[in-house]
Amino acid sequence: KENRGVNCRMMAQMLNECYLAMGFKSRFITCMPKVMINDCHVINAVYSNTLDKWLWMDPTFNAYVTDEKGNLLGIGEVRERLRNNQPVVLNEDANWNNKNKQTKEYYLDYYMAKNLYYVTCPLQSEYNAETNYPGKKWPMYISLVPEGYSSNGKPGATAYDSHNDSYFWQSPYQE
């Protein structure tokens, strides 16, 4: 229909399942604007045992993000840095669908800044998370939302809202 192959949600789900198959803890994250008009974006968070944190990976834009020293950043860290006007660096070869080179100014400062108002993901990261077939229950979701905001009652409403960044981004090995 859009003459561009699969959308960002499907690409993120495929990458998520690849990470899971390789033994990495991973989840696909829907990045939402404050007011949903017709656009959001879905990327991945993959857990690094070495760095002890979730890392930003975007299969649609072949993108990852670092700080000014080259340290890989996670989605929560990028949100916080954008909010506080701290440096973020987009990988040099970031591009949309292997066609259009991306700039930090467009991808992070405009497009993703708009889509990072709140983030949501399934409570359980698993294969076929959103595949609909007889007898399968639709997954429960959790959202990280700003204080005073609720994702309930909105399209794709979640079961749980949290205002706690530490809880949302905690280690998958934490009990």
Predicted regions located by residue number:
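Active-site neighborhood of thiol-dependent amide/isopeptide-bond enzymes
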Residues: 1-43
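His-Asp-centered catalytic microenvironments across diverse enzyme cores
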Residues: 36-38, 47, 51-175
